[in-house]
Amino acid sequence: MRILLIGEYSNVHWTLAQGLRMLGHEVTVASGGDSWKGYPRDVDLAHVLTLKGHVSFAWRLLRALPKMRGYDIVQLINPVFLELSPWPHRFIFDYLRRYNKNIVLGAFGMDHYWVKVNRELRPMRYSDFNIGDVVRTDKVAQTDVDIWIGTEAERLCERLAKDKEVQIDDLNKLAYYTGWTILRKSGSLTKPLLSNG
């Protein structure tokens, strides 16, 4: 089976690729190496935020996209799967969906639902957004709120999670459905996060 893993979070995709290769699958990891962590990858999509870095990233991405066709499975690490602002992701996602058989959406790292549930409802005693009953208002917590709430990243996350052609594996379904169930019970959400399943 041909498998493409896009994005990285704590070396999850590279480790998964090693295991899948041992089972005889053809696996390609395309990522930026999880930013400063520099994890291994087959296709380097690191993005340095300088003029030269932007040009280099755009060139490497445009050269890589035609090679990202014909896979049996493409797994995205999360809705923002490249080191890039959310807006271009929708076009890259549409391209990947058009030229590959199956898309699987991971729920690794931050996303809109994680931020919303943990910030507003605090189902866990400790999270990125609360310590016990005390809501974190420090710069680190607020940065994630600013990225994921009321933004293009939120809209991208909702679009991918609701796309009928995107599969969400069982572990990630649990993450998305748990968030949906908590939001629904609280009255913060009136319709399911996922329409595909």
Task: Tell me the role of every PLM-derived stretch.
Residues 46-67:
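Glycine-rich, highly charged phosphate/nucleotide-binding loops
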Residues 65-69, 91-99, 127-166:
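Membrane-proximal helix-turn-helix segments that form the acceptor-binding/catalytic region
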Residues 83-121:
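Conserved nucleotide-sugar donor-interacting segment of glycosyltransferase catalytic cores
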Residues 184-197:
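Conserved donor-binding/catalytic core segment of Leloir-type glycosyltransferases
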